[in-house]
Structure formats: C-alpha cells, structure tokens
C-alpha cells in the first residue's frame, strides 16, 4: 500500500506542481507585457482572416502554383462555353426559319388579309371551369344571337390594335408609351426578329412593321442589337454567356409636324439695352416610345458612361431581349393577358416563399420546439439567362 501511495504522488509532488504552475503564469505575464511579442501576435492574427483571398495568401507557394493551374483550366472552360453559346445561336437561327411561316400566318390573321378556317380557329379550353361557364352561357348566347339578327353584325377586319394592346398590357412597354404615341402604335402590324447571317458577328434585329400612316413614311423601323459571346480578357471568370454590348437604331422619316420625339417651345427674350421683348421658338427633346430607335451608344473609346447613361443603356438592352425572348414568340398570350398572369403568379410565388421563411424565423425566436427539421427546403425559382 505504501508503494502505491508513493507512486501516485504525495504532498511534495502537489506542492511542486503548484510552484511550476505559478512560475508558468508569471512567465506568461512577462511575455505578454513585452511589446515586441504583442506586435508579433497581432500581426499573426491580422494575417489569419476568414476571407478567401486572405486564406489563399497564407498557402505555400507550391499550392498557389497548383491553384494558378486550375485557373488556367477555368479560362479554357470559359472559351469552350463561349463556343457552346455560339452553336446555340446557330440553332436559334435555324429554328427561327421554322417558326417564321407560323408567324407570317399570324400576321395575316391579325391584319385580316386571311380569314382562319373553322379548323384553324377551333380552340378547346382545358379549364373545366371555363367549359362549364361556356355551357351555362349557351342558351343566353342563342337568345342574344336572335336579338342581334335584326342588327347588322359588326365584323372588324383582323384583330384591331393587336400589338398596341400588347404594349398597353406589358408594364415594361407601357411605361415608355406616351399618350401621343398611342395613335401611331395602333398602326403597328407586326414585329419580327431577324438573326445575323452565318459567319457574321452575333446580333439580332427587331423589325417593327407599320401600315401606311400620317406620321412617318417608313414601312419598317429597325433596332439592331449586337452581341458578344467570348470571355473578357481582363476578367474571363465573369463570363456567363452571350451579352448585348451595343445597339443601333434607325432614322425615322417623320412627316411635317408629326415628330413626337421633339416638342416646340416658345421663349421670350428681353433686349438688355432697348428693353424690347421678342419671342423665339426652339425644338427640345420630348419623351416618347419612338426614342427607342435613337439609342445611346455604348462607349467604345475606353471612356466609361455616367451612371444614368449606363442605366438607360442597360434598360434598353433588357427591353430588346424581352421583345426577342417573350413578346414576339408568345404575342397572343400577351394580347390576352395569359402570359402576364403567368409572370405575376411566378412573382407572387417568390414573395410567398419569402413570407413563409420570415414566419419560420419568427417561430424559432418564440419557441424552438415548433421547428420541424423534416420540413422540405424551399426550392429556388428557376431563372432563365440570356
């Protein structure tokens, strides 16, 4: 038993351990009071940061070399991706030619040049509620038809104001349209998208076809959007696909006194010496949708645009892209409002998800027991990029 007590350490060992601990504390205090030691520790802490770039700086040179090799591979991936989008553009051009006969037929129906056959105009709703409502209304329709038999049936040509109605329905476009633009847009008969020819730089043209009118002589107004599908040499990792980089409009041949993009103002001037007053007139720019055909130019001389100009140009690019991707391919659905309802439902769904998340967070603050760990995660909304 005595041997075991000695091996386990006696009072003398405890005293020695306490003395060592005290000495260690004193030594630590002395070290921490040394300004040079504190400076070295602070420098060490400053270098250890949670930001990725700071972390990379702390890596050995050999590891940094391998990371540079990975970046080289990433640049090569970006160039392959650029080629992929170029081929996608070629496919878009190919299928645009297949769509065009259908769009030409659409124009004929809209303008009234061709009347659709019974087979072409037959449309069966998939909405049961609409079908039921249609059935309930049959008798009323029959009665109404009998009452209208004595009255000449109105039958306007084609679909009046088709494209103007789309402009009015779509917020992005209606914001551009002034009251004095409306009579002109009622003459718009068609909008087409034309892609650049094979082997030419990527671009597309929006063609706005107008019937003869009292405002300008051009049968077609055009807007060309130039695109780029290659990584930026200065920042190759920012590449995310083709982007619109510039656009060109066209000259509108306005008839006398019909140019809505300018307005005439009168200004009185007083002569300093004689005190006489004269009235002068001058033209100043006027807000109008038709300024769309006189766009700002992207800076090509290395000088950056001011913030307002950059915003205006970016908005222009967005509108051009929207015409190409949404309005022209799905025109009838924007005319009826169905496409707009789909867009609104999509946005409301996103807002609902945010509200639900906020509600969950509040619940966690009040009572953690209400948290359901098996709740399915909210899926991110799908986003389409250019």
UniProtKB/Swiss-Prot annotation:
GO terms for biological process: nucleosome assembly. The modification Phosphothreonine is found at residues 51, 58. It comes from the Eukaryota. Residues 1-28, 339-386 are annotated as: Disordered. The keyword Nucleus applies. Polyglutamylated and polyglycylated. These 2 modifications occur exclusively on glutamate residues and result in either polyglutamate or polyglycine chains on the gamma-carboxyl group. Both modifications can coexist on the same protein on adjacent residues, and lowering polyglycylation levels increases polyglutamylation, and reciprocally. Polyglutamylated by TTLL4. Keywords: Acetylation, Chaperone, Cytoplasm, Nucleus, Phosphoprotein. Residues 339-370 have a biased composition (Acidic residues). GO terms for cellular component: chromatin; cytoplasm; dendrite; neuronal cell body; nucleus. The keyword Membrane does not apply. A motif (Nuclear localization signal) lies at residues 265-271. The modification Phosphoserine is found at residues 5, 7, 49, 53-54, 125, 304. The modification N-acetylalanine is found at residue 2. It holds the Pfam family NAP. It is found in: Nucleus; Cytoplasm. One of its GO terms (molecular function) is chromatin binding. PANTHER family: TESTIS-SPECIFIC Y-ENCODED PROTEIN. Belongs to the nucleosome assembly protein (NAP) family. Acts as a histone chaperone in nucleosome assembly. Interacts with core (H2A, H2B, H3, H4) and linker (H1) histones. This is Nucleosome assembly protein 1-like 4. The gene is Nap1l4.
